[in-house]
Structures are given as structure tokens and as C-alpha cells.
């Protein structure tokens, strides 16, 4: 018996006008997730997902490309305004933010949510290069 052709599921259009962009920028990669107000993911992208490998993932250009891709996906769902939460010490923070702004989003607030210890755990040893 021949099996039925599988149908390709299209992404549902969610029609959400405002949301939160979480920009997680580590030393190795930059990940951008756009969520609604409750935290449900609407669109996501990262430098690695856009085809950058190795040390190129940590560049500001890779973060910009990932942010543009994520913005395009979110705009398909009717997203217009964003609050931005930036986390991490990486080099892609500012360029991802600029790319989101250039994509046509109205950015209402920018928050830095990088966790900073109040002298908690002992840090790992310093690198000697």
C-alpha cells in the first residue's frame, strides 16, 4: 500500500502586537527569543542556527543576522512593539539591539538582566593565555 503524503504544517499566525525580546549574549554565541507578555516563545534565532560556526558565532555581525531573522519571523505574527531584555557579557548585545530597532520595531524599554552575584560562589580560576 502506498502511504499518504504528509502534509506540511504551516506556522499559525498568532496576531500579537507587543512582546519581549530576550537577547542572551554569551562569549560563544548570541541567542534571541521573542516572546509574548506571558513568556510563550513566538520566534527565536541564534548565530549558530544561522550557519555561523566556531569563533564566528560570537561576532557582532552574527548577532545582527540572527536578530534580523528573528525579527522577520515575529513580524509575520503581527508583532509591532518590543521590550528588550539583554543578558550576558558577549559582544553581540548592542548589534542585536540595533538590528531589532532597524527591523521596524518600536522598542519601549531596554533592561539589562545579567545576573551579578553579591559575592556568592567562588569564581573559576582566571585564564592565562
UniProtKB/Swiss-Prot annotation:
GO CC annotation: ribonucleoprotein complex; ribosome
Subunit structure: Part of the 30S ribosomal subunit. Interacts with proteins S7 and S18. Binds to IF-3.
Organism: Sinorhizobium fredii (strain NBRC 101917 / NGR234)
Any Gene Ontology biological process: translation
Family: Belongs to the universal ribosomal protein uS11 family.
Name of protein: Small ribosomal subunit protein uS11
Alphabetized Pfam families for the sequence: Ribosomal_S11 (PF00411)
Biological function: Located on the platform of the 30S subunit, it bridges several disparate RNA helices of the 16S rRNA. Forms part of the Shine-Dalgarno cleft in the 70S ribosome.
MF term (GO), any: rRNA binding
PANTHER family: 40S RIBOSOMAL PROTEIN S14/30S RIBOSOMAL PROTEIN S11
SUPFAM superfamilies linked: Translational machinery components
Keywords from the UniProt entry: Ribonucleoprotein, Ribosomal protein, RNA-binding, rRNA-binding
